[in-house]
């Protein structure tokens, strides 16, 4: 099949003007999907002629039938039938309603004749858009490889009929919609036409809200909210970007959990997780959805074998289902989770020709397992869903009640908001609903991840955004001059980042940026830089490998590596500041300032608008060893590795390496801070030896081998997504914490509570964690252990919250209110563990954590996990600790109490003293 660009050139070859009949008022065409594109667009941006493909065939749609019998348009008509005919020499059939067209074609030497019916022997069939008897024949003709030239307008038809839903009832749309082209009841302006030298853009927005309102009402009948509070799942956020797609459940940030769409003659409903198919509270919605998808046919509902629970929920509502491993030929509705690329085309045709598809899937786990690969581009579910105008993102949503759109109240939609953004940017005035521009930025950045090459529906948005950003200076967000996220300037930051990541050369579009992440004074090395990167990863997850290189902002770099390494699932990453700030109210930096991509070729190009340190991401269990990586367009950054970098080399790095960020590394910890801070560090060795002692203590308490299989990372940033610091890979902290990381004297005197707290968070395991009670508690065991065993700082001085009078008061307050595990959180919960440690030492904890690591099939709910902890700790210390934990109001099961009765009583149980001296409540 020819590319859209080549097809447009063929259709417009020799066409120098659009001499359309003045008395023929056309209608605007709506284009959706990935195959359709405009050919003729008026001065108002309305599409009046469009083309597409379906199956093996092709389609040209003209927005008034009189255009097809206008002799002045002969050059275009000849091009059209020539392009449509995939079998050279095959005859052209013309429906009697367009008989003059046959004469026009014959007069130009084309074998054309009037045919009342479409036949397989024809190469092209020409017909008006009002025929109601040949719908299925025309679709099958096109699908088998025939070309279809069809013309008509729907505004007059709509005025004469009772059914106002033109998109779904107009006869022509029952044919052309399978290929993504719809006749609308919007009149087309004919005052000015321009013959385009290149393919025109598809409009961002074509008004069709009225056609979808009934669908929304039917889907949400009797439903005021979509409550998944107790579903125990985190659904993916859906990106609703199609003109005929619409959200059904939104959170307070306009994040969508369930959406629906029309596509061709069929319908689609998507949920952000397959678990939502099993949520009892969603039962009424699930019934509505299946009935809507069926479209009144009362046809066969097929449920994928893995989703058999849904079958039971539907049966309660009187809907019979058939449980099958795959889609069947007689299905009306198919409910399933897409897990592979197999059958995508068949499923899309199933919907286009009238089927209903009910999809449940999340993409965040796939994204975690495939770093550097966009789920919008490669996740199997999105290969299916992108053309429908709904995509599943890697962003998760919190489970909870989701509001449903209400009639008469505007609801956020990517396309309508983008259209308003375009107007505001052009006129410098306008008013968008609160929160919409804050949502537009990340949604636009996500949309731009969908592969757009030779797909006009996506390229049109790219072209629009490039045009907008080339006109207006990109704002610079700093702490001194923050950018409000929910405004055009905030949206521009996300959209510009998305454009850069999609491959646009932003050096032509945006001015040089000067902030913490990108300096206009950085000039890349004139010659390529080759570094040896250790690409062995014995860990159980991917890891970043530092290169000691920095990439200036807006710089397109070229990365080269050996052929063998190009097939080893390596990725490249520019930037280390991974926090997503798209939900921040104010921005001190761009909301997303890193870029990742696969190193799947020996030579690869990548850019990042903001610049950043360069990393190679190595997958788990990689055994590649040292790999030479050559980079064009980089500069050196300060880098010190304990045991490898000499003091003389470090001093030279600080003086000569211009990168604004640098790293201090051991085999167990890597600190990433601004170069300005590193210049105050004359000799990093004593500091890093202390950090290695800290990491050894962290590993010892957590029963981990040392040296660590992979080093932990701590990265300083001007703004982070949550809190003062937060755990993860990497641990993130504010710039104000840099001295706490790199000042050895300060660490030894004041301690290191914050960073070790986050290192402790990374040590927590779900097997012995009882969220939310211990989330901010057990991690502090590492703080106490490190401060006392490495830094020599007693717990009472390490944190004011552990001063003995404060601890005692906290316990008494807890008991005075009536001990209840609901109130057992944070410092109060930590006290339980500290009492055990002060009585039995650290060794029982270390042995216990070792035992947990070696066990399998452990419980997952809090009550069972807490009872297992009581049993295991009691066995470790050979004391019956059930009374101790009961005093703390743990839900100790009777069988556990009985099983521990043989152990000696713990007579020193400090909770006895508290209970004896506690005032009655």
Curated annotation (Swiss-Prot):
Molecular-function GO terms, alphabetical: transmembrane transporter binding
Span of domain Peptidase M60: 542-841
Range of residues in the leader sequence: none
GO CC term (a single one): plasma membrane
Pfam families: M60-like_N, Peptidase_M60
Chief localisation class: membrane
UniProt entry keywords in alphabetical sequence: Cell membrane, Membrane, Transport
An individual GO BP term: positive regulation of protein targeting to membrane
Superkingdom of this protein's organism: Eukaryota
PANTHER family referenced in this protein's UniProt entry, alphabetically: EXPERIMENTAL AUTOIMMUNE PROSTATITIS ANTIGEN 2-RELATED, TRPM8 CHANNEL-ASSOCIATED FACTOR 1
Entry's family note: Belongs to the TCAF family.
Function comment: Positively regulates the plasma membrane cation channel TRPM8 activity. Involved in the recruitment of TRPM8 to the cell surface. Promotes prostate cancer cell migration inhibition in a TRPM8-dependent manner.
Name of the protein described by the UniProt record: TRPM8 channel-associated factor 1
Gene: TCAF1
